[in-house]
From Swiss-Prot:
Reactions listed under catalytic activity: fluoride(in) = fluoride(out)
GO molecular function: fluoride channel activity; metal ion binding
Residues that hold Na(+) according to the record: 75, 78
Protein name: Fluoride-specific ion channel FluC
Regions that span the bilayer: 5-25, 35-55, 67-87, 96-116
PANTHER family: FLUORIDE EXPORT PROTEIN 1-RELATED
UniProt keywords, alphabetically: Cell inner membrane, Cell membrane, Ion channel, Ion transport, Membrane, Metal-binding, Sodium, Transmembrane, Transmembrane helix, Transport
GO biological process: cellular detoxification of fluoride
Amino acid sequence: MFYSIVAIFVGAGLGALLRWFLSLALNAFFPAVPLGTLASNLIGGYVIGVAAVVFTVRVGLPPEWRLFVITGFLGGLTTFSTYSVEVMTHALEGEFGWALAVAALHLTGSFALTALGMWTARAWLAVA
């Protein structure tokens, strides 16, 4: 359990630092679309795709490596990567209805909860 905690902790720290560095390096180029965040999400999507296959095929790898990469590093870098692999897994298995449903659920759910959170905070803080 200790090694699992350390793997997640170190991975998350490194992922968060990379996301921050990408934001510092890229966000000023096109402020309307934070390119650092976009880069973080695209990198995360690619890395989780690789990791999903590697950890499925290389079953002998210690579980701490999966925790380090997926839960820690990608969790710190982005939350978009897990969503991406879940949708693409459905699509690659020919489950296009499920892929669309999962994508729609994540997207609409995220927007709805973001709006709800903004509304709640504005109400608490009495902001117009």
